Design a protein with these regions (language model features):
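Extended boundary segments
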Residues: 1-49, 120-122
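Short, basic/aromatic beta-hairpin or loop at an interaction surface
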Residues: 45-60
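Short alpha-helix capping/helix-loop boundary micro-motifs
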Residues: 62-69
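Short, compositionally biased
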Residues: 86-109
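Glycine- and charge-enriched low-complexity intrinsically disordered segments
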Residues: 104-124
Length: 124
């Protein structure tokens, strides 16, 4: 039996997206392991401003790369983004919304829970 990984709230990690299918393992969740050097753990609801900022920051998430199983993203897609990239977007004032219940706890090594909660769309 596989142990479910945890989110930033200490609860079971919820699915981020299966359309497009996301995650380091391409399992729909922001699961991670020590081989995930990019720490693809933030479940973000991307918007055009964030996507353009990422492209200018050197991480083009718009252009499809089927050889890597990457469809290219558009406004409104959910995607497991790199925690360090998301942290830089917060500092640059270009951060998009996030789902904290779908964001892996490892994210907290790079971004505080308070910063994440400012952009959370799944908290009451």
């Amino acid at each position: 039996m596989t142990v479910k990984q945890k989110n930033v709230l200490g609860e079971d990690l919820e699915e981020c997206s299966v359309d497009p299918v996301t995650g380091w393992y391409r399992d729909g969740c922001c699961n991670t392991d020590n081989n995930d050097l990019g720490v693809h753990t933030v479940c973000a609801k991307v918007n055009n401003e964030f996507l353009e900022w990422c492209k200018q920051d050197g991480n083009d998430l718009i252009t499809p790369h089927p050889e890597y199983g990457f469809p290219g993203l558009k406004d409104g897609d959910n995607w497991c983004v790199c925690a360090s990239s998301y942290a830089r977007s917060v500092d640059a004032g270009k951060a998009c919304s996030v789902y904290v219940k779908r964001t892996h706890e490892k994210t907290l090594t790079l971004i505080s829970i308070d910063k994440l909660k400012k952009f959370a769309i799944d908290l009451s």
